[in-house]
């Protein structure tokens, strides 16, 4: 059973995507959202089940990193969208997944490319049942080639 336990960084990535989404739709600032997650969402019991522990430092680094570097991250994403597509045309959740993944690919060279892409594709699958995860896979792969080659 412990082999199925979600890794703390995986939990942090999912939380970062949720936080980025929350910031976009509510207009909340990064520090208040990080504080909210730390106080109310991590290490909590939900309906009798203990949630997996998150790497809270990694979570905060992801959230702050995306916000700090969002203009450059968005440029990297837009470069890989189909001709004529604008970032705003994407679903807010897809934008959050792409931004978090692109941040890691562009600014966290300590994390292997394959790990980043796989983690965010799995996160996308948890939100979408359609072709979005394939789109995110392709976009992150292209961003990785731009950022790491």
From Swiss-Prot:
Transmembrane segments: none
GO molecular function: RNA binding
InterPro entries, per database record: NusB-like_sf (IPR035926), NusB_fam (IPR011605), NusB_RsmB_TIM44 (IPR006027)
UniProt superkingdom: Bacteria
Positions of disulphide bridges: none
A family per Pfam: NusB
Biological-process GO terms, alphabetical: DNA-templated transcription termination; transcription antitermination
Cellular component GO terms held in the UniProt record: cytosol
UniProtKB keywords: RNA-binding, Transcription, Transcription antitermination, Transcription regulation
General function of this protein: Involved in transcription antitermination. Required for transcription of ribosomal RNA (rRNA) genes. Binds specifically to the boxA antiterminator sequence of the ribosomal RNA (rrn) operons.
PANTHER family: ANTITERMINATION NUSB DOMAIN-CONTAINING PROTEIN (PTHR11078:SF3), N UTILIZATION SUBSTANCE PROTEIN B-RELATED (PTHR11078)
Family indicated by similarity: Belongs to the NusB family.
Name listed for the protein in its UniProt record: Transcription antitermination protein NusB
Organism: Caulobacter vibrioides (strain NA1000 / CB15N)
Gene name in the database record: nusB
């Amino acid at each position: 059973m412990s082999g199925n336990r979600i890794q703390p960084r995986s939990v942090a990535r999912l939380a970062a995507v949720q936080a980025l989404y929350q910031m976009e739709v509510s207009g909340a600032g990064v520090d208040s959202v990080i504080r909210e997650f730390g106080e109310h969402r991590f290490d909590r019991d939900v309906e009798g089940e203990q949630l997996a522990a998150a790497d809270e430092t990694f979570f905060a680094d992801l959230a702050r990193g995306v916000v700090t570097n969002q203009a450059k991250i968005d440029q990297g994403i837009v470069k890989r969208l189909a001709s004529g597509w604008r970032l705003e045309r994407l679903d807010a959740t897809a934008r959050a997944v792409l931004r978090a993944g692109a941040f890691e690919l562009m600014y966290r060279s300590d994390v292997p490319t394959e790990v980043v892409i796989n983690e965010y594709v799995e996160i996308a699958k948890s939100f979408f049942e359609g072709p979005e995860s394939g789109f995110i896979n392709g976009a992150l792969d292209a961003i990785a080639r731009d950022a790491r080659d």
